[in-house]
């Protein structure tokens, strides 16, 4: 007879993890899930093992809103190694060309300017984008080249930080779906010397503050200290979590009276005075402004629930709201 499955906690919130070097995003996710004893967990956009930095991890009901963090802007610090091009466009790949670096600051500045603003980018074959249900990197490892469509991206800011020897350090603020390694590979070809990513750190996702990041070492130390003292680590761990609606704070808020919110919790759209005329909204309830989910503005102006937080208390059946 198998060992009974251990029941996890129904803990909800967003943890800003500082992902370490060398681990995959999924490895880190599973470690955090175990440390928090969480029933459900998901990350919001993978970082390569080579990369470090901000990896928001959604626990419990917060996983329902992780897509909105996937769609948000990101900020990175990257070091490009000039003169060497690799097949993966990073330091883990095989060297495919080596060229002399004979550049001026003016040439670098001119090249960087061409990457600012809106552009079309062809994703790397060593990306997790899927083709016929399989990640592109699996085709690449088999030596198979798959045709990829160019995607619209925006580089809002591209800052020159330093240039020492063959190392060029940049800071990039970009839209969702931007591949930093592709920018560096394209930059190297534009400069005529080739380049690859030797260092990559994600500084920010959406508007989350970097000072709220915690490391796996810090989490592990909290758990071990609590266990050594015979107490639960959960209160200390839970204090690190940001609220669920932190993933959707960019949506305008619609605050409902509890009597109106009851209809929304049953999936019914409601009329709300002063609601936006279109788009997505963040729905809160009562004077405490408790977050209950997100909604959209229907064609008739009503607020229609789209994704709701599950409550432990059942909502009683209510009459259908009069549309008039």
Swiss-Prot record:
One of its GO terms (biological process) is mRNA pseudouridine synthesis. It catalyses: uridine(55) in tRNA = pseudouridine(55) in tRNA. Keywords: Isomerase, tRNA processing. It comes from the Bacteria. GO terms for molecular function: pseudouridine synthase activity; RNA binding; tRNA pseudouridine(55) synthase activity. Its EC number is 5.4.99.25. It is an enzyme of class 5 (isomerase). Signal peptide: none annotated. Substrate binds at residues 43, 76, 179, 200. The active site is at residue 48. Pfam families: TruB-C_2, TruB_C_2, TruB_N. InterPro entries: PsdUridine_synth_cat_dom_sf (IPR020103), PsdUridine_synth_N (IPR002501), PUA-like_sf (IPR015947), PUA_sf (IPR036974), tRNA_psdUridine_synth_TruB (IPR014780), tRNA_sdUridine_synth_fam1_C (IPR015240), TruB_C (IPR032819). Responsible for synthesis of pseudouridine from uracil-55 in the psi GC loop of transfer RNAs. Belongs to the pseudouridine synthase TruB family. Type 1 subfamily. PANTHER family: PSEUDOURIDYLATE SYNTHASE TRUB1 (PTHR13767:SF2), TRNA-PSEUDOURIDINE SYNTHASE (PTHR13767). This is tRNA pseudouridine synthase B. It comes from Yersinia pestis. The gene is truB.
